[in-house]
Amino acid sequence: MTQTTNGSYGLGDFVLQSGIVLSNAFIGYQTYGALNSRRDNVIVFPTWYTGTNGQVAPYVAKGKALDPEKYFIVIPDMFTNGSSTSPSNAADPHRDLDFPLVTPFDNVIAQRRLLEEYFNVTGIELMAGFSMSGQLAYHWAALHSDLVKRACSICGTAKTSPHNWAMLHAYKSTMEASPNWLNSACSEWDPKILTIVSSIGATMAMSQDWYRQGQHLSGDIIDVASAIENLKSLFASWVPANLYAQTLTWMAADVSDNSTFNGDLAAALAAIKIPFLMMPCNTDLYFRVADNEAEIPYMSNATLTVIESSSGHMAGLPGFSSDDDAFVNEQLLKLLRIPSIN
């Protein structure tokens, strides 16, 4: 039986990139497998927008890239997802809408502390991520290559694109439009706001082709309206203030926005020397193939492999499509076979 653990690690007073201190911060995690004697047989796969650590499970199995009999697999929870420090559980004065911006940079610092301070990890064979955690892969590769040997971004980019930012602004402004947003609506969903947020998600997460093919129809889901109703359950499970804070994190994603690169995106991409795999989906409406194509000329050791699928952004979501999962797994296996440079 595969060894698994769930837990959280206390980070103490965690200084954010902004200089604001999160008191008694903590990071949640799930692990599979066991560390070897060198403590370097590690794969890291953080959570994503609306993701929690248990959702990576479809990628984890004997013989797969994320093989718990071969690797120690760590699934860190991103700040704001409810399992790590978030608006809903933060210490005063950072509860609810007083929660400060937490950047991808901050998340990676916290994840590295978890790995080194708690698990005493000495090396990472692969850092992979989907969507928002695919954006974290760029941060790991550009800023922490002393620890990580390979990285993969599945349906992600080094910086949130203008169109992606505009979509996120739709989520943000919709939540802010709730009549009681500054009071109870940040902790409990206004039904009308929940419907609008779910409609935005249904519009953007899957492609036009996916709907045209009738992929949304199954069981009680007989039309697009009932598909949106079904998606409500995902968003309803989130505290609105947590989703709001996670939206701000996604909007702020930029691998060059730190004191190392000072906003020079080309320099940040050029700093990625380890084997790096970009895996966009050809029908993704969030992260376009063209966005990755624009990045790759600056990177000396990167490969771009396209997921050909009608699933849109969900092509990279573990468990959404068995065909997409199989393709992603095969590409990760190939990446793991590439010799490391460090």
Q: At which residue positions do the language-model features occur?
A:
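Short beta-strand element of the alpha/beta-hydrolase
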Residues: 39-50
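Short alpha-helix in the alpha/beta-hydrolase fold that links the catalytic acid
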Residues: 258-265, 274, 285-298
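Short beta-strand/loop motif that positions the catalytic acidic residue
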Residues: 272, 278-280
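Catalytic active-site module of serine/aspartate enzymes centered on a nucleophile-bearing elbow/loop
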Residues: 293-297, 301-342
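Gly/Pro-rich cap/lid or specificity-loop segments adjacent to the active site
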Residues: 22, 50-136, 142, 146-168, ...
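Alpha/beta-hydrolase-fold enzymes
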Residues: 147-149, 153-233
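A short loop-to-beta-strand scaffold at the N-terminal edge of the catalytic core in hydrolase folds
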Residues: 22-34
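Acidic catalytic loop of the alpha/beta-hydrolase fold
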Residues: 250-254, 282-287
